[in-house]
């Protein structure tokens, strides 16, 4: 996969302030505030920064945590996992494999079949209809 690389100024000009803060500066949207937290429509969730398909809506579930949650990415190669020790915690950050956008974190407390919970900020993704 060919990487997309831009300067922070280029990203800032493309994204709204909240998208920039979360996707490029590794921020977090407030729980229960994102537009996709309760979303039930079918489709594919894409990276807001580069359009890479990330999650199938059929893998979305209600974790009750305040952020959209998925039990699997559309492909393992769609994201990169990075050890995150910020805020006094040990977590696994997930970023877009194509543009390095911060998406959220993955936790080992999800449902079958994977047992994983990809906890993703709504501002980082865009739900599109299936082709």
UniProtKB/Swiss-Prot annotation:
Cofactor: Zn(2+)
Keyword Transcription: no
Domain MsrB: 8-130
Keyword field: Metal-binding, Oxidoreductase, Zinc
GO cellular component: cytoplasm
Residue positions of the active site: 119
GO molecular function, one term: zinc ion binding
Pfam families named in the record: SelR
GO terms (BP aspect): protein repair; response to oxidative stress
EC identifiers of the protein: 1.8.4.12
Binding-site list for Zn(2+): 47, 50, 96, 99
Cofactor note: Binds 1 zinc ion per subunit. The zinc ion is important for the structural integrity of the protein.
Sequence similarity: Belongs to the MsrB Met sulfoxide reductase family.
Listed HAMAP family: MsrB
Protein name: Peptide methionine sulfoxide reductase MsrB
The encoding gene: msrB
């Amino acid at each position: 996969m060919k990487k997309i690389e831009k300067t922070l100024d280029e990203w800032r000009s493309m994204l709204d302030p909240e998208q920039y803060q979360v996707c490029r500066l590794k921020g977090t949207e407030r729980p229960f505030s994102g537009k996709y937290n309760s979303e039930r429509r079918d489709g594919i969730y894409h990276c807001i920064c580069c359009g890479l398909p990330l999650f199938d809506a059929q893998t979305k579930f209600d974790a009750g945590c305040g952020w959209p949650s998925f039990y699997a990415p559309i492909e393992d190669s769609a994201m990169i996992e990075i050890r995150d020790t910020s805020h006094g915690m040990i977590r696994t950050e997930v970023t877009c494999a194509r543009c390095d956008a911060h998406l959220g974190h993955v936790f080992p407390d999800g449902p079958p079949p994977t047992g994983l919970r990809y906890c993703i900020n709504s501002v980082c993704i865009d739900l599109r209809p299936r082709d």
